[in-house]
Amino acid sequence: GLLSGCSNYFNPGIRRDGEAEPARKSDDDIRPWCNQDTVMQPFTPSDPDFYTTDAITDHAVSFLDECGAGEEPFFLYLAHCAPHFPLQAWPEDIKKYRDRYAVGWAEIRQRRYARLLELGLIDPRWGLPAADERSEASYAGLGEHAVEAMAVYAAMVDRLDQSIGRVLDKIRDLGKEENTLVLFMSDNGGCAEEIHNTPHLPPGTIDSYQT
């Protein structure tokens, strides 16, 4: 896992043959990773399909195979980095959300309200409040780059959701779902940093480092 706050999701280390230079917070900022007692700096994955969220989940599932199959209790602390910056995600995940954020503030707002009603999370008597014109105008002025950034962020959360699902599926496969307490927590809030080291590139790729 990662010892510091964030790193490139596709390649935390140095450039691999045939690939672009992995973007970093600064040119000489090589983040340390560890595996058990071994610290790796740089950590350059040999797998070209490496993605941090997937890799952390792979280790969690392996741990459950090793320690969760017996009668002894187990404790798994699974600390994902996503959706912390940099904004990087698989293209197939980004594609799911690109059109969703391009429809505009009013339409997004209406769809979210309809979804809350569909899920039964709010009473139909709770109407959708009048829109704040300032918010709509602010959203309209964001531009295509910000809309793409929102799609990438959503894609990172989507992959995180897939990963948590894999862990829960493994617990079920082991027959431990009725005897396992699962707690999900999230820290931080909105990003307080503005980092656009690669303004000429769209967010999401290995050579792009943006918040």
Enumerate the predicted regions with their spans:
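Histidine-centered active-site microenvironments of extracellular/periplasmic hydrolases
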Residues: 88-89, 169-211
